[in-house]
């Protein structure tokens, strides 16, 4: 994925450049200041991407296989897994093609490589935007299920969920296409950062409200029978805790990426910012790690999904 015209790793491979910096690697700091740069080997990118790819394929397969998981919430989870799958797949594809070009094992014209780079950029950006949107959709779905429990099934219906999913994918593709077309405009980068922050604020507000309700629930039923207390407390706390974990992981894994975009706008030539830019390999690795962690959370915290995953694995053998 690119943010500046010189940051075209695939095209750079045609010129047999020795640099091993993938994707968004910026120019080296020209001031001579010492910078901490974390080197991420291409093999690690491929390994992380492969693990994420397998995990997310299993999640999507399990949800598609089990009709009990065809609820709106699991539809959003399935789409989030699909977004993670696209993130991993696009990074694996770019890394693999780059290695082949650098080794001379793949011959391609510059125009073909540029088109491939554009496609990979659109896929990566689309999956990023859709991940944000689906995390927000999951948060809203859980919020409605807790605060409007009696009306939940009339508010969040499967047809509405499908329309929301379709709208998210269409909007993500259109916005990512515009982003790639106008990547050199600061306003485009700022829009992405603002969107990221807005979604984080929205989800954080919902999570805090849900946690507050869960705490009130626990206090109100503390004097009741233990089984009743666990039944009431488990529904609110488990859902809120799951979403809070998801938000925290997403922020830690994606935060550096959006910090990178912000600094490109605010201080593209500053020595300190240049040092941060040189660690974009690490930021990409964190994004792929997020795609690895998400399926683990779903599999271990959902008994129905975990059971279906076991059936899928047993059938594959």
From Swiss-Prot:
It is found in: Cell membrane. Residues 64-72, 141-163, 212-240, 301-317 are cytoplasmic. Keywords: Cell membrane, G-protein coupled receptor, Glycoprotein, Lipoprotein, Membrane, Palmitate, Receptor, Transducer, Transmembrane, Transmembrane helix. The keyword Iron does not apply. One of its GO terms (biological process) is adenylate cyclase-activating G protein-coupled receptor signaling pathway. Its main location: membrane. Residues 1-37, 94-118, 184-191, 267-279 are extracellular. A lipid is attached at residue 315 (S-palmitoyl cysteine). It is a multi-pass membrane protein. One of its GO terms (cellular component) is plasma membrane. The chain crosses the membrane at residues 38-63, 73-93, 119-140, 164-183, 192-211, 241-266, 280-300. Glycans are attached at residue 29. Disulfide bonds: none annotated. The keyword Glycoprotein applies. GO terms for molecular function: melanocyte-stimulating hormone receptor activity. Receptor for MSH (alpha, beta and gamma) and ACTH. The activity of this receptor is mediated by G proteins which activate adenylate cyclase. Mediates melanogenesis, the production of eumelanin (black/brown) and phaeomelanin (red/yellow), via regulation of cAMP signaling in melanocytes. Interacts with MGRN1, but does not undergo MGRN1-mediated ubiquitination; this interaction competes with GNAS-binding and thus inhibits agonist-induced cAMP production. Interacts with OPN3; the interaction results in a decrease in MC1R-mediated cAMP signaling and ultimately a decrease in melanin production in melanocytes. Belongs to the G-protein coupled receptor 1 family. This is Melanocyte-stimulating hormone receptor. It comes from Macaca nigra.
